[in-house]
Design a protein with these regions (language model features):
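Charged, low-complexity intrinsically disordered terminal segments
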Residues: 1-442, 447-450, 454-460, 471
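A cytosolic-side transmembrane-helix exit/cap motif
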Residues: 463-473
Length: 473
């Protein structure tokens, strides 16, 4: 827990204003009376899902970005098949792009044969060249309307790591929720299902009775709604003492980065924990390219030392926490279907703070070149021009070696030219395209012609649809 003195309790009026602002920003009401359990890493999630599905009596709803044809995915499918065979209504939504290369359509034949239903979100369509950008990135399991789990965990074996090769499990976070908030979770699922075909013909589950003392918001975002983005911005503005963020694919846009920078300059302890090694290398390069303005504002940045950090969490002032599927980037904020819970409870926020501190024990802190403290704005002296030579190169090599040894001993790494990787990749790509355009223009002409033709045909098709819908004059 944070050792600083506790913040003074806000007045009732101030608290009501804050709750109103958060509800309006997120587009989600605060629902009291819930019990919440914190799940850490894939194994805990898979065991909880399995036990809940085995206990199902009326219905099981599953929505996940990836359900892979591997031991974890097959075990989940077996539990769903068994539930369907004993008369439970089983409905599954998975993302087309997420499952591409992870499971074929035939993977679901046993469940369909048992009476289960499977729908796929946003297949690639000829009439929508850019429609594939929107993905169903949610991770949700609902059982009988009385048990629910949301998280960042997909149903795939890579979350368990590979003990035979010494690969540790992926680090991820999720929740089990019981209580009235399950009504909002089920409605979010029903909305997703109805967006892919006929609505569920199953009667809505009555709102569960209170199961605990935790108040939370279920934030079910859709493309272009930006509810979670507004909430994240508001939390950055409202934090008074701490704002500790964990994110798998952080690509901060200027407005959000400015919110974090303003909080840090106002004395808030802002921290960002991101992967040290990522399964999406391009995103990791973009993330590192944005470290410098954060560090210069006094924000502390940590990189995870394990195989992959996939959690998406926030905890502020030991009072407020968020857990779910949303990353701090434009894809999650504006393009995807995402699902998060924002929890207003000191005890739960305390658990999240303790977990964050445990996670920091397995990280390397990124620091500016002048050491522990950020360099004040305007304090960087101009670099003198020096003649090159073997001695300067040897000194630079010795400095890099010292930085490496120091990082290993202190769990700190000096921020190098982090923007260089992204700039190098972008520059080489553009130069290569320019060379191709000069030497082999037909190699670029054909893809460009196909893309223009695809977009043009899509626009003409939409125009015909509008014409057919026009009422006769």
């Amino acid at each position: 827990m944070n050792a600083a003195a506790p913040l003074p309790r806000p007045t009732l009026h101030a608290r009501l204003l804050a709750e109103q602002a958060l509800s309006r920003a997120a587009g989600a009401p605060l629902v009291a009376g819930n019990a919440v359990e914190l799940l850490i890493d894939g194994a805990a999630h898979f065991a909880a899902w399995q036990a809940a599905i085995e206990s199902a009596r009326t219905h099981v709803f599953v929505e996940n970005y990836i359900i892979a044809d591997d031991p974890v995915g097959r075990e989940l499918r077996a539990a769903l098949v068994a539930a369907a065979q004993r008369g439970v209504r089983v409905c599954v939504i998975h993302d087309w792009l997420g499952n591409l290369g992870n499971a074929r359509a035939a993977f679901w034949l046993p469940l369909r044969a048992a009476g289960g239903e499977v729908r796929v979100y946003n297949r690639l369509r000829a009439d929508s060249p850019f429609g594939w950008i929107s993905r169903d990135h949610r991770k949700l399991v609902l059982v009988d309307g009385v048990w629910g789990s949301l998280s960042g965990v997909c149903a795939a074996a890579k979350w368990l790591g590979d003990p035979t090769r010494g690969v540790p499990p992926w680090r991820d976070t999720g929740l089990v929720i019981r209580g009235p908030a399950l009504g909002d979770l089920e409605q979010a699922y029903r909305d997703s299902w109805a967006g892919l075909g006929a609505p569920l013909d199953l009667a809505a589950t009555p709102v569960p009775a209170p199961a605990g003392a935790i108040a939370l918001r279920v934030i079910a975002t859709h493309p272009q709604t930006a509810g979670l983005y507004r909430l994240d911005q508001l939390v950055a503005a409202m934090a008074q003492r701490t704002l500790w963020l964990t994110d798998a694919y952080f690509v901060g846009i200027p407005t959000y980065v400015q919110g974090l920078v303003s909080a840090a300059r106002d004395g808030v302890d802002v921290r960002l924990l991101v992967p040290g090694s990522s399964n999406l290398h391009a995103v990791a390069a973009l993330s590192r390219a944005g470290y410098r303005p954060l560090l210069e504002a006094g924000i502390r940045v940590f990189e995870w030392n394990g195989s992959m950090l996939h959690a998406k969490t926030a905890v502020a002032d030991d009072r407020w926490a968020r857990v779910g599927s949303s990353n701090l980037n434009l894809s999650s904020w504006l393009a995807n279907l995402e699902l998060d819970a924002a929890i207003d409870n000191e005890d739960f926020a305390g658990l999240m703070t303790e977990q964050y501190e445990r996670d920091l024990a397995n990280t390397t802190e990124i620091v500016l070149a002048d050491g522990r403290r950020p360099r004040p704005s305007g304090a960087v002296p101009p670099r003198p021009r020096r003649a090159g030579g073997s001695s300067s190169r040897a000194a630079a090599g010795a400095l890099r070696l010292a930085n490496t040894v120091g990082a290993a001993l202190s769990n700190r790494r000096v921020l190098g030219p982090s923007e260089g990787g992204a700039l190098l990749a972008g520059g080489l790509l553009l130069v290569a395209l320019a060379v191709l355009a000069v030497l082999l223009p037909q190699l670029l002409a054909w893809p460009l012609a196909l893309l223009c033709g695809w977009i043009g045909a899509s626009l003409l098709r939409k125009r015909l649809r509008l014409r057919r819908r026009r009422p006769p004059s």
